Amino acid sequence: SYTTKDIDFLTQLFSEEALIIVGKVIRSTPQTDGKSLPQHQVEYNIKSKRTYLERLKILFRQNKEINLQFSDFKIMRHPTQEGLYGVTLRQKYSSDLYSDDGYLFLLWDFRDEATPLIHVRTWQPRMLDDRTLLPEEEIFNIRNFNLQ
């Protein structure tokens, strides 16, 4: 739905009270001493469904192409609540203006099979810095969210 820029589909997919955490990698320029590598910082923001979708509309207009590659899927069923699943996956995102590589977590609700919903969407960078992978135990999964 991102690559086809189908905002109507995304509107149906996210629950009205969805927790949406977006991250953006801020790349700084190399130090002038020539010895230091550029540092990467990640800026996180919590968005409501409405503000997230409004921002997507702008991104869709600004970018001719948006490419996504998904891999490393991990699916976990909620231990006590039927129909809830956590999906963690690696996402490589590239567009005309920005690119990143990180992990998405989506909390899916299939209790109404006709209209599945996403209640939680998070993003984390794959790399903590130029040399350090995000430790696997720090990647969000269904255990990070209290669903009571």
Regions from the language model: what does each represent?
Residues D33-S99:
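Surface-exposed, charged secondary-structure patches
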Residues F14-E17, K24-I26, K74, L89-Y93, ...:
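A mature extracytoplasmic/lumenal domain signature
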Residues I7-D8, E16, I66, T115-P116:
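Loop/turn elements at helix/coil->beta-strand transitions in domains of secreted/extracellular proteins
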Residues S95-Q148:
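Low-complexity, intrinsically disordered terminal/linker segments enriched in charged
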Residues S1-F9, L13:
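Short, aromatic-enriched amphipathic alpha-helices that serve as compact interaction elements
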Residues L19-I21, E65-M76, K92, L107-D109, ...:
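Ser/Thr- (and often Asn-) enriched beta-sheet segments in non-cytosolic proteins
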Residues Q12-P38:
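Short, solvent-exposed secondary-structure junction/capping segments
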